[in-house]
Curated annotation (Swiss-Prot):
Pfam families: Ribosomal_S8e. It comes from Thermoplasma volcanium (strain ATCC 51530 / DSM 4299 / JCM 9571 / NBRC 15438 / GSS1). One of its GO terms (molecular function) is structural constituent of ribosome. Part of the 30S ribosomal subunit. This is Small ribosomal subunit protein eS8. The lineage of its organism: Archaea, Methanobacteriati, Thermoplasmatota, Thermoplasmata, Thermoplasmatales.
Amino acid sequence: MTIFQGKSGKKPTGGNLKQAKKKRRFELGREPTLTKLGTKVERKVIRTMGGNSKAILFTADTANVYDIHEKKIKKVKIITVKENPANSHYVQRNIINKGTIISTEIGEAIVTSRPGQDGVINAKLLN
């Protein structure tokens, strides 16, 4: 089953609208990725509009963390998800998205990338 992102076809009163056109492929969406913390990296590259590509990250165990003081990027192992402003239930399920605070080997970091869209977890070290 796909997600349709076009007009609903209903009037505000509940009656049916006259259909102006058929459903088009560009009006389709997809389910949210919900990148999870796992033991290995699972990623898939999909075709998007205009022939472009998008990398979807399903599971990850490492993150590219930027250290502000040293001004260096380190690839470190993610231990757990600490806090998620998008949804508090994502913490229990270890789901990582943009803005999530993760616990890593070198300290806590905030995720700056969109793992479901970019295919990688980039983060910035918190003090």
